[in-house]
Regions:
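Thiamine diphosphate
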Residues: 28-223
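Active-site pocket-lining segments that scaffold enzyme catalytic pockets across diverse folds
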Residues: 1-22
Length: 223
């Protein structure tokens, strides 16, 4: 999803990310230079993603604001959607895998607990356990348009509507996923050299800013 959407974000829009999985997934891909991005990492928790998105969107009602977050972060802050000032320039991509997927992948220490991860760490099964109607009905009853996808084909079918530049209606686009697929995607990305390529690009950009002497100084500090 990040790969498909990142390069297609409308020029001049803004995008807010949930922490960890949402932010990391998009970090592997470039977004247009005119797009501003933000993430609520101050407290390093799930709180406040939707509230921050709403507040920013209120300041610039003529500008599109996108939000990308997982189900736990969404349900933690879902009361923000009921705010009477909720605008028509907000697009929310809700990645619903039914748990805190972050704790199940191989890079997280939590994965060593195996079958105990879901019930005791990843909060699996809460909030409707990937109900197909819970978020849909909540959004529609608040006057927010709803889209959903349970496959790549369905996601691509709804993607253009989600990215439309009309600022006369807001969307919640709920994509149902499986943690096993997300974890495999992460494993493939981190083992194909893409991460190394990204690090090299970052290194080159930093070098262009601080120069050779600056890079040498940074290397001495890191040693």
């Amino acid at each position: 999803m990040a790969k498909q959407l990142s390069c297609r974000l409308p020029e001049g829009c803004a995008i807010h990310f949930g922490i960890l999985t949402s932010l990391r997934s998009w970090d592997f891909f470039e977004i247009p230079k005119s797009v501003n991005s933000a993430c609520n990492v101050g407290g390093f928790g799930t709180d406040g993603t939707l509230s921050s998105l709403l507040g920013a969107a209120l300041v610039h009602p003529e500008k599109l604001y996108f939000g990308v977050l997982g189900d736990l972060a969404f349900f933690y802050d879902m009361n923000a959607l009921g705010n009477r000032h909720f605008g028509k320039n907000i697009r929310i991509l809700l990645v619903n895998n039914g748990k805190g997927c972050e704790f199940t992948h191989y890079l997280n220490p939590g994965h060593i607990f195996r079958e105990d991860v879901d019930p005791y760490i990843a909060a699996a099964g809460h909030y409707g356990n990937q109900s197909r109607t819970l978020v849909r009905d909540y959004a529609k009853n608040l006057g927010i348009d709803y889209l959903s996808a349970s496959s790549k084909e369905e996601f691509l079918e709804n993607m253009e509507v989600f990215l439309s530049t009309d600022v006369d209606r807001s969307f919640v686009f709920e994509a149902f996923t499986r943690d096993i697929d997300e974890n495999e995607a992460l494993r493939l990305i981190t083992s194909t050299g893409l991460v190394g390529d990204v690090k090299q690009v970052l290194k080159e950009k930093v070098g262009n800013v601080i120069g050779e002497k600056g890079m040498a100084f940074v290397k001495r500090i890191l040693k």
